[in-house]
UniProtKB/Swiss-Prot annotation:
One of several proteins that assist in the late maturation steps of the functional core of the 30S ribosomal subunit. Associates with free 30S ribosomal subunits (but not with 30S subunits that are part of 70S ribosomes or polysomes). Required for efficient processing of 16S rRNA. May interact with the 5'-terminal helix region of 16S rRNA. PANTHER family: RIBOSOME-BINDING FACTOR A, CHLOROPLASTIC-RELATED. One of its GO terms (biological process) is maturation of SSU-rRNA. It comes from the Bacteria. GO terms for cellular component: cytosol. The keyword Cytoplasm applies. HAMAP family: RbfA. Pfam families: RBFA. InterPro entries: KH_dom-like_a/b (IPR015946), RbfA (IPR000238), RbfA_dom_sf (IPR023799), Ribosome-bd_factorA_CS (IPR020053). The lineage of its organism: Bacteria, Pseudomonadati, Pseudomonadota, Gammaproteobacteria, Enterobacterales. This is Ribosome-binding factor A. Keywords: Cytoplasm, Ribosome biogenesis.
Length: 136
């Protein structure tokens, strides 16, 4: 009977949970701020892991590339510390080497949602104005 998820996917899910907890509770770097782990990709041999993060302060402010660059730089500098805490939290023979990347899918999703909302509003206004003209 085949398993529903491969081992790498299960390890990636568990790593995502543990790294999120570590970032919330243990990492005190102010450059990181409110970082959210949106996904983890683990290599087949579990030697490398790419961690995708978003920053909540970027969502509330204008998309600021300096905040993102500084946050990713700080996370990559703290990757050894995060890796050591991850090794204590998870039972793995080899703890993967971590690299952090910015995940802009949430920002892009919000931008697309705003575009759709604006198009719907403009369409409703256009319909209302044409209906108003036809009544006259």
């Amino acid at each position: 009977m085949a398993r529903e998820f491969s081992r790498t996917q299960r390890v990636a899910q568990e790593m995502q949970k543990e790294i999120a907890i570590i970032l919330q509770r243990e990492v005190k770097d102010p450059r990181i701020g409110m970082a959210t782990v949106s996904g983890v990709e683990v290599s087949r041999d579990l030697a490398y892991a790419k961690v995708f993060v978003t920053f909540l302060n970027v969502l509330t402010e204008e998309h600021d590339s300096d905040v993102v660059k500084n946050g990713i730089k700080a996370l990559n500098e703290a990757s050894g510390f995060i890796r050591s805490l991850l090794g204590k939290a998870m039972r793995l023979r080899v703890v993967p080497e971590l690299t952090f990347s910015y995940d802009n899918s949430l920002v892009e999703g919000m931008r697309m949602s705003n575009l759709v909302t604006n198009v719907v509003k403009n369409d409703e206004q256009r319909r209302a104005s044409t209906d108003h003209k036809e009544e006259k």
